[in-house]
């Protein structure tokens, strides 16, 4: 690879002419095909034959990172538009091109058959194409990566990478080998797998990439492509007021995923008693979408221009995440800010840490009741000057949060940015470098005849996810009847997940090799828990 291309891929901040970019892309693709064709030996997987179709089909299941966005405006696809799911899209050049991460610190000259192997347990996510094995050159060192599970017991297989949403305690690879670490990639909602929100579940992993800033490789700002995204101009006040006069409510709600742990509809239902809200999605729907084409895609993630123009007319957007957890923030928050609507937000309790300034969103939980919130919104609706104070972050110099600014500056991956690697390849390299330095440390320790200090284990902590038990969107759990579907579904799911983490931990501790015994362990865990109560 030419130095110029390496810089392009790694540096990401340089400005290059389009033709240079293109030739680098072509060169990289060619190199990549060569690398894939190079034979690998010694037990590492070198398996072709998984068809392109299968690869894309698999990835297709992961196309929609924010589970609420059920519909996709595929016919209006705009390649330039922001899709944080770029990591999953095999057709995205960004994924293909920027998957080499070799940094100036990497002087690794080992051949493929000497390199440690990282196994992607969730093969749908394997961020390489074509083939199912690949050499990766990372900032500090190199590894082989594969999705072929036949290497799972190999002594060179040093780490297994799991996708949180697909991780099933009853399908985990057993026995767990002492020389292997487990790595977790989970950028999606905590509701997709509550096992990871409990200590016994998260501690199964050594390295994590989650939405939490506390994880080893944080993906917290995955839905914010750039700071400039926030500075997109809002519709004028006059125009917004005109839409109000034309019969638009001050507040927009657009959600089609209704039975979620945050139980948001229970709150919205109360709020609607005191405040005009236009609801177009399947949840609490009270209006027909004026545009037939957008009707069944009203919760789309894409930045379809018509969809965006329509939603920008509203002064306020109800921005409620499907689950409540520190640092879990999605497009529900960032998109209204991009459009210049004020988010009325409930989701990450620590959301303020990431806001462009101290006066840019309205937090639902700052208000004692839906009625008080409604009164506040109505005041702002009739006071343009007070309203506009919430958009000052869009003015030059208006984005003052240095934590936000520096976090964006420091992040090494890009969102739909062809010049920066995506976070799947980034995390893979993070694990590769960690494993190589662990191998080195273990060798040094052995040579020292146990003289020095043994390398410390690295184990994920509760706060790498740590999402709290779901609570009702409005009122208290005691007031809600046992027959309520939210109560039946999410409280059970949450606590059953705790038991799953404990059961798997017990299986690992006892060197269990038979996955089928998982439910016996679950039963045992359940009995133990009932006895302790
Ligand atoms: C995985 O690799 C082994 C050995 O290299 C090979 O025999 C097998 O067919 C591969 N499996 C898949 C699913 O490609
Ligand atoms: C927000 O206000 C607090 C104190 O009121 C201050 O410490 C903090 O720096 C402010 N943050 C921003 C982004 O202005
Ligand atoms: C990985 O985590 C497990 C606990 O799940 C721990 O027993 C092991 O020592 C850790 N391995 C390393 C290399 O840190
Ligand atoms: C599990 O295996 C490890 C080493 O392979 C051994 O040290 C440990 O005692 C075993 N544990 C049980 C409960 O058999």
Curated annotation (Swiss-Prot):
It catalyses: L-threonyl-[protein] + GDP-beta-L-fucose = 3-O-(alpha-L-fucosyl)-L-threonyl-[protein] + GDP + H(+); L-seryl-[protein] + GDP-beta-L-fucose = 3-O-(alpha-L-fucosyl)-L-seryl-[protein] + GDP + H(+). GO terms for biological process: positive regulation of protein secretion. InterPro entries: Alpha-1_3-FUT_met, Glyco_tran_10_C, Glyco_tran_10_N, Glyco_trans_10, GT10-like_C_sf. It comes from the Eukaryota. Residues 1-20 are cytoplasmic. Its main location: endoplasmic reticulum. Glycans are attached at residues 148, 206, 358, 511. Pathway: Protein modification; protein glycosylation. It is found in: Endoplasmic reticulum membrane. The chain crosses the membrane at residues 21-37. GO terms for cellular component: endoplasmic reticulum; endoplasmic reticulum membrane; Golgi membrane. Keywords: Disulfide bond, Endoplasmic reticulum, Glycoprotein, Glycosyltransferase, Membrane, Signal-anchor, Transferase, Transmembrane, Transmembrane helix. Pfam families: Glyco_tran_10_N, Glyco_transf_10. The keyword Transmembrane helix applies. One of its GO terms (molecular function) is alpha-(1->3)-fucosyltransferase activity. Residues 38-533 are lumenal. It is an enzyme of class 2 (transferase). PANTHER family: ALPHA- 1,3 -FUCOSYLTRANSFERASE, ALPHA-(1,3)-FUCOSYLTRANSFERASE 11. Belongs to the glycosyltransferase 10 family. This is GDP-fucose protein O-fucosyltransferase 4.
